[in-house]
């Protein structure tokens, strides 16, 4: 930790993910002295571990890349899927100010973005939804440009062999490697990119790390220090106003004395959710729940939420998360995307029955795993654990949990019981504890749907979102395939997440609010430490990062405006 006693800045930002970095970048360019403190030994948080997508309708990148959209369409879409869970003014503020924020970031950092063609909004058939997608993602970035700051960049989620850099738009094509010429061509493109990076001496990073690295350079050029291994312990208040934070050097042990960093004009919390806080998860979220199923950053233990609550901050949507059906593999959970959409697979509960469209958006899928409205109800979740069922043909054709098509399933996965293999469906039922008669009946009925191309029970394959990760060569439905080629497999599925959703209630300026909607002066929040503008839903790829960046930006602008007004006064 690069900490000196008696530090004072205009603005103190807690957390170095997208929310914190954009907030700090904005404050610095408003002429405010700014510091970022980060609890972890690396910067980037959950953003660096993510796909790096940014969902902001009508931004300059989408316009440049020829995406046809209007503010009215985007407004109609978001209001339809969010409903009245979130104030309309907050939704509209996000849509109105998000494009402005992104243009600012592109101007003041080396970040380069591009549209993700065809990566559909998650509810494209809803009025205003876009089957062609509204998501942008970072282009591969040479992390060597970070210089000495490279060692502090958050490691990637999953292994990246031989400097291979995969973008979101690559992943869907790579899943078609054995099925479509586009898969072969994309594989060649990714290989050429890796080779070019190696021979040219570049250290290419992709996805979330390609978003964070340019932001870090932007902060460096703006003169903003990032203090690693610096954990928030409490907020400092004078005369009812937040004017600083207490921090602890995490390398000095739990008994290290807290130190004060003063903030003349405000503190912005961008410290992430509480996905790695077992106590908070058990308190707020429905069973079964654990910190072992999340892929969020390990440092996210709700510190900002706890500190703000002490000052009377209202908390909202604490029961929810950015869920996704997850395979709890040995060592690290696997957040399943294409695995649920590829034909030749279904998900069943412990009764051997299907209970949802397996290909639906991942937050909603976990709501169905728990059961009830938005996953809420009495007692433990109704469909947990569930099992993803597939056959050898599926395994030979598609990527599964990072394994290439046809690649042998590691013995440790089988030995752990997370993946079960059997020669027959009846044997698979016995090994997984499923009722064989009901299970085989479910498979038989589903196979009929696969032959006809119509899922009469859950309409899988009817949405453009379903089809995005489907197999275009599989007829008559890209998401439905018979399960009949042994051996057969079952992969345990649990409600994992990218991070928790609930947090501090904020207004359109990012200010922290109490239960009566009064403002906690000097305190702001953005990202997963705050209650989401998206409510219980998820509009499209990048629907977490887009709001995090936007409300971090707006918080910094509000502090700058308040500071300017106080100087005039």
UniProtKB/Swiss-Prot annotation:
Any one GO BP annotation for this protein: steroid biosynthetic process
An example Gene Ontology molecular-function term: 3-oxosteroid 1-dehydrogenase activity
Cofactors, names only: FAD
Residue numbers spanned by region Disordered: 127-148
Keyword match Lipid metabolism: yes
Catalyzed reactions: a 3-oxosteroid + A = a 3-oxo-Delta(1)-steroid + AH2; a 3-oxo-Delta(4)-steroid + A = a 3-oxo-Delta(1,4)-steroid + AH2
UniProt-annotated binding residues for FAD: 10-39
Phenotypic consequence of gene deletion: Cells show an accumulation of 4-androstene-3,17-dione (AD) in the cholesterol degradation process.
Similarity comment: family membership: Belongs to the FAD-dependent oxidoreductase 2 family. 3-oxosteroid dehydrogenase subfamily.
Purpose: Is also involved in the formation of 1,4-androstadiene-3,17-dione (ADD) from 4-androstene-3,17-dione (AD) to.
Record-given protein name: 3-oxosteroid 1-dehydrogenase
Provenance organism: Mycolicibacterium smegmatis (strain ATCC 700084 / mc(2)155)
Gene that encodes it: ksdD
